[in-house]
């Protein structure tokens, strides 16, 4: 039986089959619908703003593969770039000209980048950036924020958001005490707590790593002055400031969140959008830091598929498309139209909530609170109401993230007609909650 009370025969069968072959039946935990219950639709194909499952049901997609699909699914220019690259070879394990072109484009667009290294995932990017920060400072401790998720490297699975928040665990078995000891955590949006943490660790902190917009606890915005305050504190203590822009990179703005908020970190981590839907990641920053990375320097990092020709081709095509005049104005306007419309629908139904949006990211919290500024606030989300909302919208053919701790995403393929249809469905569902 599925979440709609009927049968989802093909997806149900596939999920059952997958469970005997893949842990939990999925290759990333949140996809299993543990937080909301029911059987996840197995997706057969997608185009534009729409996805179709193995049972033939179509959905307006606001997950966007968890962020990368800023152009929508299967955009012609990206598909063509991948096809043209594939006939020349899928992987060489040797340098290619497209790696240079993608690096040049990233350095051109992202304020903090003077040099960049391509990797295969956001986790690889954050893991490598932290290793570099520790090597450059000679310090061990890192500071992160409750509810911020930076990938599944051991040192970053302490008080993490996203999947760990979804499953209600503060860390993961297998993370050693020694690793956890070197990972310090404080609440997001609390500069006093950051200062206090530095005061308590006179031996010094190697790096502060932060999502400039906390998308892994449901799109929580930084308070005015918060990011600049982090910049000032890190400069004061000789600590490396790392912006994890794997999610916010090119979602908030063409210059990423750092350009939007006019705060320049020492290192930046990227992923998702820069691969156009293919596996990719990157980390970069000041030349003096990046020249410490092997083979230019002693800090080792490598990858068989790093700089993959298909991923770089897809990334270049995507970055070219989003660099066109008016792209972000249109995308931001549509995201605002969606969140304002859903908010009005919930208001009309008398359902307490808080919503946020920035660029093409958005978050919705079912709460009596007037604002959500940290993980403790986000955790007050009414999970039962969220489950009802999720399943009712899914029944209406609208696919939101199956967890209250995940941001939503709008693509340029979500035109006003699709946005308005979503709002109409939200108004219908809100009356039933």
From Swiss-Prot:
Pathway: Porphyrin-containing compound metabolism; protoporphyrin-IX biosynthesis; 5-aminolevulinate from L-glutamyl-tRNA(Glu): step 2/2
InterPro entries recorded: 4pyrrol_synth_GluAld_NH2Trfase, Aminotrans_3, Aminotrans_3_PPA_site, PyrdxlP-dep_Trfase, PyrdxlP-dep_Trfase_major, PyrdxlP-dep_Trfase_small
Reaction(s) the record says it catalyses: (S)-4-amino-5-oxopentanoate = 5-aminolevulinate
Enzyme Commission no: 5.4.3.8
One GO BP: protoporphyrinogen IX biosynthetic process
UniProt KW keywords: Cytoplasm, Isomerase, Porphyrin biosynthesis, Pyridoxal phosphate
Chief place of localization: cytoplasm
NCBIfam families listed in its UniProt record: hemL (TIGR00713), PRK00062.1 (NF000818)
Name of protein: Glutamate-1-semialdehyde 2,1-aminomutase
The organism of origin for this protein: Magnetococcus marinus (strain ATCC BAA-1437 / JCM 17883 / MC-1)
Organism placement in taxonomy: Bacteria, Pseudomonadati, Pseudomonadota, Alphaproteobacteria, Magnetococcales
């Amino acid at each position: 039986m599925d979440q709609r009370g009927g049968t989802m025969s093909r997806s149900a069968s596939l999920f059952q089959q997958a469970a005997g072959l893949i842990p939990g039946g999925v290759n990333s935990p949140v996809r299993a619908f543990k937080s909301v219950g029911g059987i996840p639709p197995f997706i057969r194909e997608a185009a534009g703003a729409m996805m179709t499952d193995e049972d033939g049901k179509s959905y307006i997609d606001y997950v966007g593969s968890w962020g990368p699909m800023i152009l929508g699914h299967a955009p012609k220019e990206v598909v063509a770039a991948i096809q043209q690259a594939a006939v020349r070879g899928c992987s060489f394990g040797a340098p290619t000209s497209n790696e240079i072109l993608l690096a040049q484009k990233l350095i051109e667009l992202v304020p903090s980048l003077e040099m960049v290294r391509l990797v295969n995932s956001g986790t690889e990017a954050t893991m490598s950036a932290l290793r570099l920060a520790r090597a450059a400072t000679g310090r061990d401790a890192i500071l992160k924020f409750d509810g911020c998720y930076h990938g599944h490297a051991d040192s970053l699975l302490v008080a993490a958001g996203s999947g760990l928040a979804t499953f209600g665990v503060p860390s993961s078995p297998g993370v050693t005490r020694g690793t956890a000891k070197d990972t310090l955590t404080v609440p997001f949006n609390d500069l006093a707590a950051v200062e206090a943490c530095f005061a308590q660790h006179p031996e010094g902190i190697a790096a502060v790593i932060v999502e400039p917009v906390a998308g892994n606890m449901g799109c929580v915005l930084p308070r005015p002055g918060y990011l600049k305050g982090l910049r000032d504190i890190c400069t004061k203590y000789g600590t490396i400031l790392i912006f994890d822009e794997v999610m916010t990179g090119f979602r908030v703005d063409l210059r990423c969140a750092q350009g939007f908020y006019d705060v320049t970190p020492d290192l930046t981590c990227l992923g998702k959008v820069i691969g156009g839907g293919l596996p990719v990641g990157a980390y970069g920053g000041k030349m003096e830091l990046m020249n410490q990375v092997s083979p230019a320097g002693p800090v080792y990092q490598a990858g068989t598929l790093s700089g993959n020709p298909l991923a770089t081709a897809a990334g270049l095509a995507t970055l070219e498309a989003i660099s066109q005049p008016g792209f972000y104005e249109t995308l931001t306007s549509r995201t605002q139209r969606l969140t304002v419309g859903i908010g009005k629908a919930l208001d009309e139904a008398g359902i307490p909530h808080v919503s946020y949006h920035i660029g093409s990211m958005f978050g919705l919290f079912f709460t009596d609170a007037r604002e959500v500024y940290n993980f403790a606030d986000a955790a007050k989300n009414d999970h039962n109401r969220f489950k009802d909302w999720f399943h009712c919208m899914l029944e209406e053919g609208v696919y939101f993230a199956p967890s209250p701790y995940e941001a939503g995403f709008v693509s340029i393929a979500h035109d006003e007609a699709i946005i308005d249809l979503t709002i109409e469905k939200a108004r219908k569902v809100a009356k039933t909650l």
